[in-house]
């Protein structure tokens, strides 16, 4: 039987298939726990992330096809990972759940440019549950919305982007001195401020971590793209990965550079980042894998 995107199951609970046992000594500081009933109906069980004491914890949320494509090539897509996930409702719910838990959402400029109307809040991807997410954040003593950090070395951003103009959503653009000069010429909204942290053409991962720490952020969510994810992996700053595996094969050829899960970073022999599988969930034909990286 042929399976098409239109025939995929949507809105199903993220059924738990396997959970790793709790470590003998559970971390003292954690974020999350039992979910509100409206969220638990879609994600049975608890959602807990261990927090570092000495630095912000960073978790990543990414999507990949069966053959490892995380995003289509520039010009092929205007929705980021939407075409890869098949616009899965379950994937959008997982995105909302992690945003609801986070102090900060970090996105790379490339991811910003392909989603002009996107706003990095739980309510944007799950509007029917907006009040539930707001109440959940209030119960955890979190700000009404996570602060969004856009990483752009060049400062080449569209000031009319919906995510840069959403009421009540603070945005910081982490950039270089050259990028800051360009941004100073743009009509950015009052909720956007610029942090000059990079040098040359690069925003170092360590400097980005300092921006998160200065905000008082304990938990940051990286939503890519693959270049930013690779930078954070290379700096050994990614603590967990929530990976949606979409049940499609996209393919690659010489006509366009479709992005893998990690771009711009390669690890030498014996230097790759290994992770331990901590949970497996499914919704329809989608798999939701959670990995914890070793220290």
Where are these regions (language model features)?
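Enzymes that bind and transform nitrogen-containing heteroaromatic metabolites
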Residues: 1-295
């Amino acid at each position: 039987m042929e399976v098409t995107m239109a025939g995929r199951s949507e809105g199903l609970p993220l059924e738990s298939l396997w959970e790793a046992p709790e470590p003998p000594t559970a971390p003292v500081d954690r974020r999350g726990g039992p979910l509100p009933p409206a969220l638990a109906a879609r994600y049975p069980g608890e959602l807990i992330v261990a927090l570092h004491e000495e630095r912000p914890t960073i978790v990543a949320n990414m999507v990949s096809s069966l053959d490892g494509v995380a995003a289509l090539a520039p010009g092929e897509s205007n929705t980021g990972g939407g075409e890869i996930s098949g616009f899965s409702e379950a994937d959008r719910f997982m995105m909302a759940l992690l945003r609801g838990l986070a102090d900060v959402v970090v996105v790379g400029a490339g991811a910003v440019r392909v989603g002009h109307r996107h706003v990095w809040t739980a309510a944007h991807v799950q509007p029917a549950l907006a009040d539930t997410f707001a109440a959940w954040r209030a119960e955890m003593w979190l700000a009404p919305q996570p602060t969004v950090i856009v990483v752009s070395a060049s400062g080449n951003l569209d000031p009319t982007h919906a995510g840069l103009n959403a009421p009540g959503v603070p945005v910081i653009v982490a950039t270089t001195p050259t990028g800051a000069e360009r941004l100073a010429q743009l009509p950015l909204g009052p909720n956007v401020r610029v942090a000059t942290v990079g040098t040359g053409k690069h925003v170092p991962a360590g400097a980005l971590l300092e921006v998160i720490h200065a905000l008082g952020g304990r938990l940051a969510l990286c939503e890519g793209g693959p270049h930013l994810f690779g930078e954070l992996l290379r700096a050994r700053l990614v603590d967990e990965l929530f990976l949606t595996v979409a049940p499609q094969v996209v393919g690659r050829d010489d006509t366009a550079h479709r992005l893998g899960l990690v771009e711009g970073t390669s690890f030498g022999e014996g230097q790759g980042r290994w992770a331990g599988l901590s949970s497996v969930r499914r919704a329809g034909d989608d798999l939701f894998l959670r990995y914890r990286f070793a220290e």
